[in-house]
Amino acid sequence: GIDIHPGARIGPGFFIDHGTGVVIGETAEIGERVRLYQAVTLGAKRFPTDDNGDPRKGLARHPIVEDDVVIYAGATLLGRITIGRGSTIGGNVWLTRSVPPGSQVTQANSLHELSNEALQVGT
């Protein structure tokens, strides 16, 4: 199945292809014409708590996916990161850092700590 929290904000033209296993968290923001494939997670890294250990509600903790992004099968994007407009996130990528517009992130380059040079447009 597909699990989309009702609080997620989703733009027009959003498309899920082969949606089994897709999870979209409560504070996720998805732009226009975004495509996701099976088993993609747009999740939180953690749920912050207050001084009493109670969960703090209303904090943005899920990814922002800008317009015209494609995220391939099995990718996991965690935390309040931004995936820049026109980027492509490859299959099985685990991502906890923002990427600028036009980025191409593959499993091979996500296995190493991504430097600013590795995240340049068109790489």
Regions found by a protein language model. Give the residues of each.
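Structural signal for interior beta-strand "rungs" in well-ordered beta-sheet cores
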Residues: 2-113, 117
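Long, amphipathic alpha-helical stalk/connector segments used for oligomerization, subunit docking
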Residues: 106, 122-123
